[in-house]
Regions:
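Aromatic-anchored segments of alpha-helical transmembrane domains
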Residues: 10-11, 79-85, 152-163
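N-terminal transmembrane-helix/juxtamembrane module of multi-pass inner/ER membrane proteins
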Residues: 1-52, 99, 210-215
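Membrane-interface loops
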Residues: 16-31, 61-145, 193-215
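Short hydrophobic alpha-helices at membrane interfaces in multi-pass membrane enzymes
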Residues: 143-155
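Membrane-interface loop-to-helix entry segments
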Residues: 37-51, 113-135, 169, 173
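Hydrophobic transmembrane alpha-helices
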Residues: 133-137, 179-187
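Interfacial helix-loop-helix junctions of multi-pass membrane proteins
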Residues: 117-121, 156-183
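Hydrophobic, membrane-inserted alpha-helices
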Residues: 52-56, 128-135, 152-160
Length: 215
């Protein structure tokens, strides 16, 4: 299940760029985005998110079978929506000019050089960070202080997407909303059964291939 989630995440974020390269990209910046300042040091939060993601997705994947399946199915459903939106509503952002004066500015320039300003709506940074909140909030074995800390970290990451000028406000809210809606959809729709069958079929296929290579 985890491999399926990771695989589709890569397809969503990187694969769609192969399709939308020549498309017109919309700028969803608002007046509020113009007010929000560039704060280069927040790149530490922006890039440090991966440690948070690994920890909380691991916690979300070791719950009881139904909760783990619901969490990962919601993640997959959300990424499918992202895939559709990245193609149908391609967006971009106008990044500020940053002087090459100190280490944080250099880090920002490096980030801009490796991450093109597209696939922004909704923000996958915010989406994934909020799924980290969903992953732990119902687990009785996880202390309340960590659940609160997860919310704080997730919100800090969302803010960092704005202060690094990687996203605009609508992207961040859309990411959080999509995470909640995807999880609610999985819980209410009955899609969990077909999802489990799909995962089981994929796992059986992979196992059969591995056995074939060994022989």
């Amino acid at each position: 299940m985890v491999l399926l989630a990771l695989g589709f995440n890569c397809i969503t974020y990187y694969g769609t760029r192969l399709i939308t390269g020549g498309f017109h990209h919309h700028n969803m910046s608002t007046k509020l985005d113009l007010i929000i300042p560039l704060v280069p040091w927040t790149i530490i939060i922006y890039l440090g998110c991966y440690l948070f993601w690994i920890a909380n997705y691991w916690m979300g994947s070791i719950q009881d079978e139904d909760e783990t399946a619901a969490f990962l199915c919601a993640d997959l459903c959300a990424k499918i929506v992202c895939f559709i939106l990245f193609i149908t509503v391609p967006t971009t952002i106008v990044r500020p000019e940053i002087p090459d004066t100190d280490i944080m500015n250099k880090a920002m320039l490096f980030l801009y050089s490796i991450d093109t300003p597209d696939n922004l709506f909704p923000s996958i940074h915010c989406l994934t960070s909020w799924f980290c909140v969903i992953a732990v909030r119902k687990q009785k074995t996880i202390p309340d202080w960590y659940k609160v800390l997860s919310v704080i970290i997730a919100l800090a990451i969302c803010v960092s997407t704005l202060t690094t000028k990687q996203h605009v406000v609508v992207d961040t809210f859309a990411g959080i909303a999509l995470a909640e809606l995807a999880y609610l959809f999985v819980k209410k729709s009955g899609i969990l059964g077909p999802y489990k069958k799909l995962v089981s079929a994929i796992e059986s296929f992979i196992i059969s291939i591995c056995k074939g290579h060994k022989q």
